[in-house]
């Protein structure tokens, strides 16, 4: 199966503007997050790769795995360096400092430019990349700014779903994009593998907190006819995903829109939380129960305490500080 992932991009002039409003809107300026940088948290991005030539990456060290070619050094195969944009939101060290700049980061190249302005991948390669994040990198969080279309079965057990289920059942957090087919073209389902119950499916919001027009709708009915239950209604959350400034190749910067960007905001928030609450990290023989607690805290952290779920807005918009506050009130996860 061929996956196509398309986001909106706009090259910005130097010196580039900043999108600090987005981090503020998502609750990253909350006092409860003071001093947290993601240190000691292992994050694995599966994307188009990364181009470290942007000066904002000076001093950044990553682990790189190439599922497309045989490069031993970091490379970005994507249209407009999609993976580089996503990584910059996390670990850029200058101009617009990333939201979790001290994480231990791995980037796996599994998507590439199809020559028509889209990034494509074979689902089997994406699944292999996720498996590498699990078995070789020992990730705490796997960040997937990508996705594929669900079949009529809606919970299709393709390779990406299977390996995502493997990850979350081991207590590894998977944050995945809900998809960019919102509006008239919406098929009413979030992308694969964000449809997996314990994965966190992320939609996009605008400046001001409204649902971005192309953010995908979720269905709450499983293939067997059963209904999803809290805290796993899809999508779970929205986060800023419109006109987000981040790193490109060389000294370029881009404005990007889509659920890809929104996914990274949730990944960053979760990295800060796991630094603060290391008992919530995956452990030997973890069974996913910590994820259940963290996702319930995410639901409760939204406006209204997650009492209402919307098929596009989820439980509401991310507020990183509120999420951490909810988790601090939980008992330790064993």
Stretches with model-predicted labels:
Residues 49-52, 67-69, 111-114, 147-151, ...:
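Solvent-exposed loop/turn segments at secondary-structure junctions
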Residues 32-43, 50-63, 74-122, 137-140, ...:
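Subtilisin-like serine protease catalytic core
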Residues 34, 89-93, 129-136, 145, ...:
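Structured segments of extracytoplasmic/periplasmic soluble domains
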Residues 179, 320-334:
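Secreted peptidase-domain scaffold signal
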Residues 108-112, 241-311:
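Hydrolase catalytic cores
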Residues 111-198, 232, 247-264, 309-312, ...:
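Substrate-binding/access-modulating region of protease and related hydrolase catalytic domains
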Residues 47, 191-275:
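Extracellular S/T/G-rich loop segment that most often corresponds to the catalytic His/Ser-adjacent loop
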Residues 5-44, 68-79, 212-215, 219-223, ...:
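N-terminal domain-start motif of subtilase-like serine proteases
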